[in-house]
């Protein structure tokens, strides 16, 4: 029995007297929240109340208050407001809980400047939304692996090559694998004796 409470308008077992123990945070709304305030609507049943107009998910000091993810019973705190909760054992935990981010592929809730889903720290092309991977680790000037993106690396698994300017099947870097000694001439690619003239007798030069 609670001597400091005597009325319970909404019938949720939390009293209306705001100065008493276990005061109902929402005295006219039946609720089952117990974590941040008593007796308010808690849709997902995790103990933290759904946010309301006068009770937001973050306090003025930046601490979690109402449920930042009111439809997920495994998450409730989302201090940076990016939609990913801070409980590491819950659904889709925030990998960067102190920064508001939109990444969702390699990590959840981290900065993703180009909006491609990959976090900036893991994206070799953080300002190009069409590229995010460089498997062979060659120069970023060679471009990314996505063949439909900007400036693609035509040989994404060969760190010695990335272009075939003349389209003859031999690659621009003459010192790399399958190199082209004449990168701007599709009729020539080899110059075994190094005299500046191509070996293909049917080609130019």
Residue ranges of predicted features:
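Extracellular calcium-associated, cysteine-rich motifs in secreted modular proteins
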Residues: 1-205
